Amino acid sequence: MDLILLQKVTNLGNLGDKVSVKPGYGRNFLVPQGKAVPATAANVEAFETKRAEYEAKASSILADAQSRATKFEGASVTICAHASTEGKLYGSVGPRDIAEAFTAAGLPLEKSEVILGEGAFRNVGEYDVVLHLHADVETTVKVIVESDA
């Protein structure tokens, strides 16, 4: 399935690129999310007439992500969870918990923006977490997991 990208998509391409993807990925994800349109002659022509508008929108989204990244620089959050005396958590701290903690601290964050390379945290400690705010913008924050007992 050939598509024209309306914004930058990680590991796929940039704005205006004509890409070929599997039909399910295009039909079920890229097109409904407004990230791409089918590469028909009419859509190619319509895209070229609105290219400046799409580029302006993409640059404003990037600027918003960069301003959000500056707010997160040096930020840290403490999450209290039930833990054993050895420091092992009863359960885990995952992306949803981290996003909720930052949102409660006044820094809005979606769980899909939290990248945990090694999975959820299962021990008490201090962790560096990568936030993927945009295809071009990533920042690192500190998450401290403490025992609530």
Swiss-Prot record:
Belongs to the bacterial ribosomal protein bL9 family. Pfam families: Ribosomal_L9_C (PF03948), Ribosomal_L9_N (PF01281). One of its GO terms (biological process) is translation. One of its GO terms (cellular component) is ribonucleoprotein complex. It comes from Xanthomonas oryzae pv. oryzae (strain KACC10331 / KXO85). The gene is rplI. This is Large ribosomal subunit protein bL9. Binds to the 23S rRNA. GO terms for molecular function: rRNA binding; structural constituent of ribosome. Keywords: Ribonucleoprotein, Ribosomal protein, RNA-binding, rRNA-binding. PROSITE patterns: RIBOSOMAL_L9.
